[in-house]
Amino acid sequence: MLKSDVIYLAMRQGGEEIDRVETTGPGTLDFLPNRTGQVKRNLKGDQIWITYGSGNRIDRFRSVNAVTRTEMQPPRITQSKEILAFFDANSVLTRLEQNTDFRYEEGDRRANARKATMEQATNLLTLDGAASTSDPSGKVNADKITLDQKTGSYTAEGNVSTTRQPSRKGGASSAMLSNDEIMQATARKMTSTDDNQKIHYEGDAKAWQGANRVSADSLDIDQSTHLMRAHGKVETQFFDKNTKTGPAISTTVRAADLEYSSDTRIAHYTGGVHLERPALVVDSKELRAYLKNSDSDSSLDKAFADGAVKLVSTTTEKGKGKRIRTGTSEHAEYLDRK
């Protein structure tokens, strides 16, 4: 149903079928459900052009400075400088393209991009060009974001950067994963599923909370199981808090793989592990680092190294300078004495 102050209608040869309809000024277009499961859609634009196919069915339409509203719970609202819509032989919407300054709102979810394409059959909304989406759990920026409007899952590609609010439902808080700090991350690609409970980063993935960080080829964070997994060129760095005795001490670990459980606060590194702390270097096949609560001054409680362990310890003795001790073993343990 089209409404406007002035509407022009052109008929096909013979005068029995509509060829096209257009408005000379602002108008509204209502799409009413004609089958079970469909929802009502409304469009408002500064001008509207409609092209018809055979049988007086809508083939496509175009509008400028358009706002759309889809009646669902909550309502879905979009706006853009231009909108193009395509329909099937039954006048059912199949594809919607919105160009230039696209904006999207559905409940507490927001999105924007230079261009958006909605495929009705798959319910996928693709945002292209300076794409961004946000909800109360955080925000995602990327060159391209593809959103499943039915499940809420999405994929972000190209120059991905994310900001996630602290999770109060996670496991124990530590330097590796804090329940009190915002987590930021970058990668070439990211996917989010299960209502943002499962996050996957790949391609030069980096995540950090304050000064504490982890980087790897790929990174997975599962809020439902309280697990974080990193694979390929893994490097973690976390800091003890500043104390009256001196500046913060950092612990850096490199490995091929990492699995961390916030329930146990155990970080399990495997594959050519290399640990560095001031005055201590440990190389091993695998290492289990037991982290303290994030409120503790020291981040590392203890660490167990296994397999071809090589240890270098440096101490400074008054009047004698530095003293270096080295050792090898199949097993070694580090215990924090604080």
Which positions does each model-derived feature cover?
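Mature-chain termini and adjacent capping regions
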Residues: 1-338
